[in-house]
Amino acid sequence: MRRPKKYESGEATQYISRRAALRKLQLSLNDFRRLCILKGVYPREPKHRRRAQKGSSEIKVLYHTKDIRFLLHESIVWTLRDYKIFAKKSNRDRAIKDFRNLKRRLALFPEIKLDHIVKERYPTFIDALKDLDDCLTLLFLFSTFPSLHLIPREQSNLCRRLTIEFLHYVIASKSLRKVFISIKGYYFQAEIKGQKVTWIVPHYYPFKPQSRQEVDFKVMSIFVEFYTIMLGFTNFRLFHGLNLAYPPQFPSSVLQDSEESLKDEASFVSDRIAALNFELLRTDKVQEDEEELDIDMELLEQDGDSKRIIKMKQEAQEVSRLRTLFKGLKFFINREVPREPLVILIRSFGGKVSWDSSIFAGSTYDEGDETITHQIVDRPSITTQYISRDYIQPQWVFDCVNQRQLLPTNKYFIGETLPPHLSPFVDSKRDSYIPPEEKALLDPSLIETHAQSDEDSEDEAEKEEEETVDQELLDAQLQLAYQQETAEYKKYGGPDGVNEDEEDPEDDDEDDDEEEAEEEELDEKSKRLQEEKQKMSVQSGKVHKVNKRQVHKAEVDEHRLQARMVKPRHRNLFRKLIREKQTKEKEEWLLRKKRRTIEASEKEARKTAKREARKEAAAAAAKASKLGK
């Protein structure tokens, strides 16, 4: 039996370097990158790099040998090779000025078909929905780009069309669940076929070209090329699941014979689709009751006692109420407010919305409509206001969706300081720091207790300040009253107008006898009380003081014992977990400290304001009393 040589088996044969992969596939580096992005092949990190690199200590980019063998049988490889042949022949025709042959070659340009790759990477539709987060975020970003060097205009327009179609599905299915405004953009989360899909829509800022090439738009464009095919398949399946016509179409009632529609019907329809304000054409009418919930309530009632089933019922009821949150409400969006995110929210939950017709096509009613219930404004004041509607800031819509109820509008009026906008994507049962505003939202009873504790502390501080401020005034008044009383006593010779030297000695003897008798009675009563106390005595308990040093020492000893019991192969993992725990505790402590300093500064400001007001009132009262005298 032949003895195997070194690096002929094991980890050395499981990995292959990028240079060897390029030689095996006979592709350039750019084509290899493109192929790996489209097929979902990525570099791997071996457990023992030196063994995987056959004894070499140089750091190389390694791939699984099985993945490269998998790429050898891909039909796209032949298309990428055809690109080289096409480039050589077209350059030759251009050099010899054979434009007739060049035109024929350009018509036969080899195109890459990615349909089979989408089916390979996502065997089921649920698998595609699970990987939809990055797809939507990237396509929403590219839909805002203008025509750049490496991003053609057709690609940006395609991204815009596909994302608008997906938003139409979200509105029609009423599957939106959570929203949040951040610096990065607008976060949306929808529940589609039981899968939670989260994506980011960037803010609408004018594009600023970058001088430095910090972002590789070419690589991102390859990702977009694959994601557009994937989202097209997904939209087709989702639209047909709701019996909606795909591509999106309008019913005949929307396409009225106006001058604008008769001039260019295609642009008229595309503008109305982008407005997100019209119902789409259905291939078959479906009752609303069938669309409400996908949960079989009869199946849940069979096992109604379990906590999980009760929780699912409550969630289903909340979702059914959320779908009709804005039903019966009419909104009007001012020109300074971002239109698209608010239209998505309002229409997803059953509301009606419109805007100024000069901003964008698709408005259904004007600002002067008397049936408008809410007008969304983002400016400090408005010249003309209607009594029949509420003027609110945009945050009210987002907070209502996250709280799943219509909140009072008084905190969101024009010019009001808005309440904190909390993220709904944070777990409420986490161990980290939770701000008091979030606690109050989770448990409304905490609002009253928190406010009551603040009022009690402020009242105590006010009482102390009042005592210190009025102490000097009280002392002066008491001293003045004492002086007046002593003067009257000396003037009239005692309380009854009789001089003390002229009193009878017999009266003094009688008074002394009465005092002695009273003292004897008091002594007897005190003796009886002491005897009764001795019979029914209760021993006072002793206060047990906890020694904090001993408790801390016991915790440290227990932690050390726990660390000793960890197996050697798990020590690095144990240290990592302890480090993460310490960093989390430190962050929580810093946030609590920051909160305490902010609250202390606010409380001190309120105290100083009240103190100054009290001093001014006291000074005014003193001045008034002087004038009265």
Curated annotation (Swiss-Prot):
GO molecular function, one term: RNA binding
Gene Ontology annotations of biological process type: maturation of 5.8S rRNA from tricistronic rRNA transcript (SSU-rRNA, 5.8S rRNA, LSU-rRNA); maturation of LSU-rRNA from tricistronic rRNA transcript (SSU-rRNA, 5.8S rRNA, LSU-rRNA)
Composition bias, Acidic residues: 454-470, 498-523
Composition bias type Basic and acidic residues, residue spans: 524-535, 552-561, 598-617
Coiled-coil annotated residue ranges, if any: 584-627
Positions of region (Disordered): 439-470, 488-568, 598-629
CDD domains, alphabetized: BRCT_pescadillo_like
UniProt-listed PANTHER family: PESCADILLO - RELATED, PESCADILLO HOMOLOG
The name this protein goes by in its record: Pescadillo homolog
Native source organism of the sequence: Drosophila erecta
